[in-house]
Amino acid sequence: MLLNVYNRFPVNFVKGEGLTLIDDKGDRYLDFVSGIAVNALGHAHPKMVETIQRQAETLLHVSNLYYNEAQNRAAEKLLAATGYDRVFFCNSGAEANELALKIARKYGKQLSPSKNVILYMKNSFHGRTTGTLAVTGQEKYQADYRPLIPNTVEIEFNDIDMLKAHFNSDVCAIILEPIQGEGGLTS
């Protein structure tokens, strides 16, 4: 029924309350996964439910072709907190990583036509898009999609000497997870 992108666990969650998930048998679980570490907001907090409901009653989705107040407020808060002058909203970590790769390559090209190499770590995971697969250091994800985007180099995680050996004037970026989750919780 669903595309098999994960080995699923035999549990069917039907409800969440705070840090607790409840399955279809009524068993309760502490949610230590948090949406694969992307949702630390808990489940069904009354203020969150109220905010989502209020937004859904106003505008559920508007293309980025147009302005809308909720997006403007979120952008202002992000800019104030970071000190940056621009923000780009994405739907996923893969999209954010795609943008980072594009920014790095564009900036590198401005400095030198050959400054387009991206170093990434073995056992890393950065997404399932074409660009992020090229910097995801796991053969099981890459194999079916070769040839991948060129000029990416895999480095052993935590091997500083290997990193130094491959870091040269052609490198425009290094993408890494401080703690590898998909790669086996390596730090």
Predicted segments — roles?
Residues 1-17, 34, 167:
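Active-site-adjacent loop/helix segments that line or gate small-molecule/cofactor pockets in enzymes
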Residues 23-24:
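Short, acidic, Ser/Thr-enriched surface-loop or helix-capping motifs
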Residues 27-28, 185:
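Residue-level signal for well-ordered, solvent-exposed loop/turn and beta-edge residues enriched
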Residues 28-113:
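Glycine-rich loop-to-alpha-helix module at the N-terminal edge of alpha/beta enzyme cores
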Residues 30-33, 122, 173-180:
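Short beta-strands and strand-loop turn motifs
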Residues 76-173:
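PLP-dependent aspartate aminotransferase-fold enzymes
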Residues 179-187:
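Active-site core of PLP-dependent enzymes with the aminotransferase class I/II
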